[in-house]
Amino acid sequence: MEITARFVREHLPLIRREYNKYDRGRLLVIAGSYGMAGACVLASRAALRTGCGYLNVAVPKEIYGILALSVPEAVCTVYERPEDLDDAIDKADAVLLGPGLGTLREHICPHVFRKGQKPLLIDADGLNSLANAPRLSGTATWS
């Protein structure tokens, strides 16, 4: 499949001038860890470039400053425990999980997998977590 300008026009919704950020969707990105903040920054910038309206990025406190300076358009949620993500997950229309999580994935991913009920894009370390614990994949109804 070739992705052309025509393909994009036919498959992505038109973004109207009168739309506000909430009309364009609320995305939660759960990404990044010490030494891998770049993955979080790249994923966040990509979300904004593709039309995300409201972007909330959940990061560990060690990389908060990097993200806040690199993606000032994003709202940042700092977490210490997996449960700290619950409110952000509940408010999101969709969740991106995984880029640059590193060893944090061992605690974060199983918790997010169990939450369910939202469109979930699993990437990078999120996929590694799912591969290492396949029984978790059936614990919730993600789209």
Label every model-predicted segment.
Residues 1-5, 58-143:
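Glycine-rich phosphate/dinucleotide-binding loop and adjoining beta-alpha-beta core of small-molecule
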Residues 1-30, 34:
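YjeF_N-associated NAD(P)HX repair module
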Residues 18, 46-49, 68, 86:
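A general structural signal for stabilizing positions within well-ordered secondary structure
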Residues 26, 53-56, 141:
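Residues at the starts of beta-strands that form the adenosine-phosphate
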Residues 35-49, 56, 104-107, 127-130:
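Short glycine/serine/threonine-rich phosphate/pyrophosphate-binding segments
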Residues 46-52, 91-94:
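Short, surface-exposed connector motifs at secondary-structure boundaries
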